[in-house]
């Protein structure tokens, strides 16, 4: 049973706080994740056992926070520094060595000190030789009384200096210093590396191009090696969001790294000098957390997914949570967290908390639920805070949150507002009077953008009936860039108006136009509107233009629930309509802002008959239509299944016989 919880206003006013400043914000990141209890427990188990995880869910539901929180539960293991050394036998195959965390810097420093000492000794030797040559030249010039000998001695010293200073063999000391690829301090937490959107070089490692490849000017191969994110995540967590957007080759490389726990670094560009360099396998023992939306699995490498399933977990995160006391407290904690993280906005008072919770109810799109698309809700919190700061307030109030909702409307809502104004000016839909075959349908835009906020629009639908070109060859013609689901919805609806009108439509062409749908129409939520417009056109019964409607329709005439019903009702209010018909099952899902309450009559409908009774204008034709519908209902017979005979009854009958 659903929990009967008090209104948001009553609940918030009972809280023993003045502002969100009085709310305790947990220090542990895991405890800051809101509404993902089941996913959180699985992620925690995965971290303790070093298992891989796939997190699937809508954007902004806490997938990256769950992944990042895993580092707090990873078993304590010794972090390692990774160094790359030159290979005297094969310069293009540098050697790899791992040492305990913090030791890598010491080793590199020791090699640098050794190289500097050898460099100083070499410099002293060179200077000694040069001075000796010059001194011998001066002595020879004095003995032989020839000044030119001094000139030749200086020239010889100069050539000798250049030969010794730039000799590749002598310069080899610098080339022998190893490079530190991955460095840690002894007390560091396990690394968390976000590799979302990383290219191949950043993900798998790369070898930089060397423009000077010969003549003693080249950079040693090991100094050009760069660690990839898979190596930086060694002994930690590698997080990749939108895993399906990675190239198949990169996904295959990650699979290899998961299997072998090491992966060599090579040049990623075949046109680079680094393409010829490949290191020894570099350790990359990481926990992979792959995340994505619901379509991520479709384009994910099957072998990679199989590997994760075999050695880890697949988790679908929640999009909403129950609207109860515990979860409301979590939402208040979320507001406090956002204020603490931002550090630039004031805390929220009780009136502002009420508005945020109501917005969470509204964005969930379902009764007795709260949205978990908290990234977008956090955006509302920050905008409200900015408004309060601009007005030099010390706390955020309800007025600031309401202003934020108007100021930070999604792009689709801003476009829809302008579209409604244009449609009103040019009268592409009407808000009063009655017209045959014309219905004010309702639709949403932004449903395919990944945003949690739907934007409602009025969708005029016009139907007209004409004689078919050929006898018995009537067609249903729908225009307006309909998608596949919308086209199928038109065919399904045809069963309804064939049944209700009782007329042979084989000699009719039924034209259905979705007015002004330049961006196209998809979905079946206009089914009720289509049926009403067509029945109106066939029966010549006007439709009340102050009524809007939405709802899907079964082939038997039942009105089925649809999405975005609150946004659609708001669109009807903004358009100035008086009534809106919604599916009965969606009626309790509607949550309106205070400025929209009591501005429109909301009528729930269970069947198409309920819709027609409200939408069609009273007339003799309407009475005839409903008499016909009544006869159809009375003529329907319900066959009850016979109860099968029990063994006892059968035996009794046999005995009686």
Curated annotation (Swiss-Prot):
Coiled coil: none annotated. GO terms for biological process: protein catabolic process; proteolysis; regulation of DNA-templated transcription. Changing residue 375 to A: Almost completely abolishes ATPase activity and severely reduces proteolytic activity. The keyword Phosphoprotein does not apply. The active site is at residues 525, 568. Keywords: ATP-binding, Cell membrane, Hydrolase, Membrane, Nucleotide-binding, Protease, Serine protease, Transmembrane, Transmembrane helix. It is a multi-pass membrane protein. This is Archaeal Lon protease. It comes from Thermoplasma acidophilum (strain ATCC 25905 / DSM 1728 / JCM 9062 / NBRC 15155 / AMRC-C165). The lineage of its organism: Archaea, Methanobacteriati, Thermoplasmatota, Thermoplasmata, Thermoplasmatales.
């Amino acid at each position: 049973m659903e929990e009967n919880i008090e209104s948001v206003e009553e609940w918030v006013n009972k809280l023993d706080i003045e502002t969100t400043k009085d709310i305790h914000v947990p220090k542990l990141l895991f405890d800051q994740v809101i509404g993902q209890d089941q996913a959180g427990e699985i992620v925690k188990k995965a971290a303790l056992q070093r298992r891989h995880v796939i997190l699937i869910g809508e954007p902004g539901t806490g997938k990256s926070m769950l992944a990042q929180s895993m580092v707090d539960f990873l078993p304590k293991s010794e972090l390692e520094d990774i160094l790359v050394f030159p290979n005297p036998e094969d310069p293009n195959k540098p050697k790899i060595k791992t040492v305990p965390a913090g030791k890598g810097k010491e080793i590199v420093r020791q090699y640098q000190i050794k190289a500097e000492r050898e460099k100083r000794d070499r410099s002293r030797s060179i200077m000694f030789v040069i001075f000796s040559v010059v001194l011998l030249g001066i002595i020879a010039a004095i003995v032989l009384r020839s000044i030119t000998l001094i000139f030749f001695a200086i020239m010889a010293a100069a050539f000798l200096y250049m030969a010794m200073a730039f000799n590749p063999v002598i310069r080899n000391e610098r080339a022998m210093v190893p490079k530190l690829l991955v460095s840690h301090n002894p007390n560091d937490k396990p690394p968390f590396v976000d590799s979302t959107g990383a290219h191949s070089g950043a993900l798998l490692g790369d070898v930089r191009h060397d423009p000077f490849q010969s003549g003693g000017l080249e950079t040693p191969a090991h100094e050009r090696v760069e660690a990839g994110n898979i190596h930086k995540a060694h002994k930690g967590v590698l997080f990749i969001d939108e895993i399906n957007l990675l190239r198949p080759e990169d996904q295959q490389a990650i699979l290899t790294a998961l299997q072998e726990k090491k992966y060599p670094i090579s040049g990623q560009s075949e046109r680079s000098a680094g393409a010829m360099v490949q290191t020894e396998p570099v350790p990359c023992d990481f926990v992979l957390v792959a995340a994505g939306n619901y379509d991520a699995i479709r384009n994910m490498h099957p072998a990679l997914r199989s590997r994760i399933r075999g050695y880890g977990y697949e988790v679908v995160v929640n999009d909403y949570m129950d609207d109860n006391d515990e979860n409301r407290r979590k939402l208040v904690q979320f507001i406090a967290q956002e204020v603490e993280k931002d550090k630039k906005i004031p805390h929220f008072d009780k009136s502002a908390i009420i508005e945020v919770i109501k917005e969470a109810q509204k964005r969930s799109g379902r009764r007795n639920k709260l949205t978990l698309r908290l990234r977008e809700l956090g955006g509302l919190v920050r905008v409200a805070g900015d408004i309060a700061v601009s007005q030099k307030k010390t706390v955020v109030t309800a007025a600031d949150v309401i202003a934020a909702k108007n100021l930070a409307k999604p792009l689709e809502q801003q476009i829809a507002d302008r579209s409604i104004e244009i449609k009103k000016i040019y009268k592409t839909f009407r808000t009063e009077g009655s017209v045959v075959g014309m219905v004010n349908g309702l639709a949403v835009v932004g449903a395919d953008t990944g945003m949690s906020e739907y934007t409602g629009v009025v969708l005029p639908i016009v139907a007209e009936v004409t004689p078919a070109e050929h006898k018995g060859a009537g067609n249903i013609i729908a225009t307006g860039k309909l998608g596949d689901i919308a086209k199928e919805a038109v065919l399904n609806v045809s069963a309804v108006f064939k049944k209700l009108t009782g007329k042979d439509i084989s000699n009719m062409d039924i034209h259905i136009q979705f007015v002004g749908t330049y961006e196209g129409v998809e979905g079946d939520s206009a089914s009720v509107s289509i049926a009403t417009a067509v029945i109106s056109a066939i029966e010549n019964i006007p439709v009340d233009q102050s009524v809007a409607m939405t709802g899907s329709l079964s082939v038997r005439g039942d009105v089925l629930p649809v999405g975005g019903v609150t946004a659609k009702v708001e669109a009807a209010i903004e358009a100035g309509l008086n009534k809106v018909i919604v599916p009965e099952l969606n009626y309790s899902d509607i949550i309106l802002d205070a400025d929209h309450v009591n501005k429109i009559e909301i009528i729930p409908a269970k069947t198409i008959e309920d819709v027609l009774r409200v939408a069609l204008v009273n007339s003799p034709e309407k009475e005839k239509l409903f008499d016909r519908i009544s006869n159809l209902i009375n003529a329907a017979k319900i066959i009850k299944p016979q109860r099968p005979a029990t063994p006892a009854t059968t035996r009794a009958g046999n005995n009686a016989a």
